[in-house]
From Swiss-Prot:
Alphabetic keyword roster: Ribonucleoprotein, Ribosomal protein
Annotated PANTHER family: 30S RIBOSOMAL PROTEIN S2 PROKARYOTIC AND ORGANELLAR, SMALL RIBOSOMAL SUBUNIT PROTEIN US2M
GO molecular-function terms, A-Z: structural constituent of ribosome
InterPro entries: Ribosomal_uS2 (IPR001865), Ribosomal_uS2_bac/mit/plastid (IPR005706), Ribosomal_uS2_CS (IPR018130), Ribosomal_uS2_flav_dom_sf (IPR023591)
Record-given protein name: Small ribosomal subunit protein uS2
Name of the gene this protein is made from: rpsB
GO process annotations (BP): translation
Highest taxon of the lineage: Bacteria
Keyword Isomerase: no
Ribosomal protein in keyword set: yes
Cellular compartments per GO CC: cytosolic small ribosomal subunit
Family of this protein: Belongs to the universal ribosomal protein uS2 family.
Length: 241
């Protein structure tokens, strides 16, 4: 399982919070102090909290659990997609559509439409249409791929959410809370930690910090999944004997 050290976090700037005037008092237990009117996060808390979160995500992955990575702001968007793809998991990296979890039935219909359009774009159907109709369907396909492409193969609700920026993704967190899905989240000094089951206090804006979190989570999930695959192989080997 991947673990992250204090040095890794310092180098990535995980300890830099937001300006003191934007703070959320609920984050007080995780704040070391302030420097130049910027809150400094106490990494002596962040390191064990993050490593505990990684251990739990490893367990979920080893039980074939589905993990949904959520990060829709510009600084996180591309990295979230890459991290989720690298460990065969799922992601939302553009806009979170209200009801994405709580109204899964409707989302499933949109995913079906997305897959139908994908098939049409590949089997020559688009070429038989008028230019205008083909353009309209291409636009619809692009729009659906943008919003649902990262969850089109999820096949049901996820077993956990890993969120970059609890404040920005509060709608996703509320939906997960309503459904009892555990939430792992990077929570900066301006954010409300309520509703986050595994709080990871840290900088949620710096690209280096975001990459550090995502790389560690993706590595942990991959290892958890390979444990599961190794156990499956062992079981089938025993059965064959």
């Amino acid at each position: 399982m991947a673990t992250v050290s204090m040095r890794d976090m310092l180098q990535a700037g995980v300890h830099f919070g937001h300006q003191t005037r934007y703070w959320n008092p609920k984050m007080k237990p995780f704040i070391f102090g302030a420097r130049n009117k910027v809150h400094i996060i106490n990494l002596e808390q962040t390191v064990p909290l993050f490593n505990d979160a990684l251990a739990e995500l490893n367990k979920i992955a080893s039980r074939k659990g589905k993990i949904l990575f959520v990060g829709t702001k510009r600084a996180a968007s591309e990295a979230v997609k890459e991290a989720a793809n690298s460990c065969d998991q799922f992601f939302v990296n553009h806009r979170w559509l209200g009801g994405m979890l709580t109204n899964w039935k409707t989302v499933r219909q949109s995913i079906k439409r997305l897959k139908d359009l994908e098939t049409q774009s590949q089997d020559g159907t688009f070429e038989k249409l008028t230019k205008k109709e083909a353009l309209m369907r291409t636009r619809e396909l692009d729009k659906l791929e943008n919003s649902l492409g990262g969850i089109k193969d999820m096949g049901g609700l996820p077993d956990a959410l890993f969120v970059i920026d609890a404040e920005h993704e509060h709608i996703a967190i509320n939906e997960a809370n309503n459904l009892g899905i555990p939430v792992f989240a990077i929570v900066d000094t301006n954010s409300d930690p309520d509703g986050v089951d595994f709080i990871i206090p840290g900088n949620d804006d710096a690209i280096r910090a975001i990459n550090l979190y995502l790389t560690a989570v993706a590595t942990t999930v991959r290892k958890g999944r390979s444990q599961d695959l190794a156990e499956q192989a062992e079981e089938s080997f025993v059965e064959a004997e």
